[in-house]
Amino acid sequence: MEPKLLLSAHKPLFVSCNSPFNEKTKLSVKSGLPMSTIRAARSQFMGEGLILGNKYGFWSTSRKTRVVVEPVRAAVKRRKELTFDSVVQRDKKLKLVLNIRKILVSQPDRMMSLRGLGKYRRDLGLKKRRRFIALLRKYPGVFEIVEEGAYSLRFKMTSEAERLYLDEMRIRNELEDVLVVKLRKLVMMSIDKRILLEKISHLKTDLGLPLEFRDTICQRYPQYFRVVPTPRGPALELTHWDPELAVSAAELSEDDNRTRESEERNLIIDRPPKFNRVKLPRGLNLSKSETRKISQFRDMQYISPYKDFSHLRSGTLEKEKHACGVIHELLSLTTEKRTLVDHLTHFREEFRFSQQLRGMLIRHPDLFYVSLKGERDSVFLREAYRNSELIDKDPLTLVKEKMRALVSVPRFPRRGGPRKDEEGREVEIDGSDADGEEEEEESDAEEWSDVDGYLEGEDGGNDDDGDWTDDEGEEDVPPNFDDDDEDEEEDSVKIGLSPSSRKSSSPRKKEEKVLTPVFPDGTPREKW
């Protein structure tokens, strides 16, 4: 068939015959494997697709149908709270001091040279070429520099810091039973009742474990747990399940709250309130839909972190409810009821956490707070804090607060601050305690009385009111703008004087500045 060309003025040029280029492409797949094509539903990506649906084919056993589960989404905006951020900020210096102390106590006599400390510059996170002697002198309450020879400088802990360190070691030995319970509860929450020691070491400081817990606590109690080798390293495995320990802190607090509320209200009929209010942080304004989602999530049935959760599917509300319960219980085991978000991500395999763990924590502002202060994000258990202070403080936390007080001791104390006696106790200088120092301070008080009166804004408390009325007429005289530089210097010196002294010197000054009127040629001018 020969092609015919049709020309038209209002239509473009086209071929009238059926060209093979205009036909739809047909794909044929030929293979030795038996397969059948089934008409599938229209997809949003590929349109109408083909599904290999032979029930008894080669791929039937290896290819399973996957059910798409949408992740739980609750777009809650994070609000910055200074009460929690200040907790992270005030521990910034303390963290550096504790790291230096950890290096120092590893020495035989707890004394180290500054040259030896320079080898740990990278471990301490010090990037700049900073002199260690200047760094240690910033904390005179913790470290003391000792000179041995002309070019040998060594440092050690002060007597107060040494005493605090010994108290901390004593408290850790007394709380060893509590630390064993924390390890048992941590392993009991895992899915396989086994956790790698390398992962537990990330939480050793937060849980209050000693540095050598692998060789001490993990080896002393084989009736509770044991260390087993694994292809990924040694792991702590549970050997005895205690049902009495399988009670979370949330369940205990719920029972206590219910008992206390029933006693306070003295209700005749025990019934839930008609309207359940969601307690949110101050300043966090959420929409009605977001508040409703948080309320519905809170009213869901509580899933204990110690129950078997292998049947829970990831991405469901039930799995997120269980994950929040695990994190709540894990934070309640820590000494300060907070930890780093990165530490929690190490336990994704043991607790089946989602990949968006930080987002899950932000979605529940009524339970947790995520602080972005510092190099790494921190998560707080909200109910354990009142403003920026812990409600129930661990003995190790009390020791840490004393250490923080030593870190904040300034190198040069301010004048007028509290003084310390020989035993290191603060002494307030009262009238009865400072009898011997009154004579030494009398001269200073006389010299600085005018300056203090000017700074405090006093109106001449010891002066009579009549002294101010004698010079009222002189204040109405306009100022003289023809002063010399020497007069300006005298005025600048007398700025710090009290009003009474400045008033007494003004008549003498004006007598010296009396000028006679003259003509331009210098002849005196008559007064009228």
UniProtKB/Swiss-Prot annotation:
Q: Where is the PORR domain?
A: 80-408
Skewed-composition ranges (Basic and acidic residues): 418-428
Q: Which domain of life is it from?
A: Eukaryota
- The primary site where this protein sits is plastid
Question: Which spans does this entry mark as compositional bias, Acidic residues?
Answer: 429-491
- Keywords, in A-Z order: Chloroplast, mRNA processing, mRNA splicing, Plastid, RNA-binding, Transit peptide
One of the record's GO molecular function terms: mRNA binding
Q: Which GO terms describe its cellular component?
A: chloroplast
Where are the residues of the annotated region Disordered? 410-528
What's this chain's function? RNA-binding protein involved in group II intron splicing. Binds specific group II introns and promotes their splicing. Functions in the context of a heterodimer with the ribonuclease III domain-containing protein RNC1.
Know the name of this protein?
A: Protein WHAT'S THIS FACTOR 1 homolog, chloroplastic
Protein's organism: Arabidopsis thaliana
What's the source species' lineage?
Eukaryota, Viridiplantae, Streptophyta, Embryophyta, Tracheophyta
